[in-house]
Amino acid sequence: IKTVVEGKMPSVYFLTGHGEKTIDENYKTFKSNLKNYNYDAKELNLTTESEVPEDAAIIVVPAPKTDFTDAETEKIERYMDKGGNLSLLLSPNDEKIIYKNIEKIMHQYGIGMDYNRVYETDSSKHVSGNKYEMMVNLVDLSQISDESAKEGLTDLTSELLQNDSIIPYMPASRSFYQYNAENASTLNICPLIETNETAYGENYGGN
């Protein structure tokens, strides 16, 4: 509707500058799908931009190899404080690095990150010969009791969660956890993807 009425498409910005994967090399299909949903896909480097652009519907951070700078963190926090959206795709990183600023942002929303790599012990639930590319479970949308959390899902996310024909596999993953942040009473935290009970995490990267 916004595209038809205002004549412009909201933009999905893929952050660059930290060794991330790129939209043209790694996310061609995703980029095409976004256009089908009337979103424009662009790249964003916050070391050169003074602020997050006003047309940003969401910032996607695809597998950064290094942490945000303090200045970048402040820009993202200002964007989030105005109701902006952020998607952190944090693949396991075997480097001895702590994502201090990325974790700072996550902690404001009651989410913690493990420095590990998840693997599946049941051979029927992972790709042959690769225990790190495992079958996972999409959370049943009907099990999300918080209506405001449901409303926060995009049409694309909701469609995926309701598609019973999808058998998702997740490669190169780390685990995350929820904890009681100071502002916990104002948050709606909802997992969307979970491993099977036969999956475990092994230490990987960090200090």
Model regions: which residues?
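Short boundary motifs at domain starts and secondary-structure transition points
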Residues: I1-K8, S50, A181-E182
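Hydrophobic targeting/anchoring helices
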Residues: K2-T29, N33
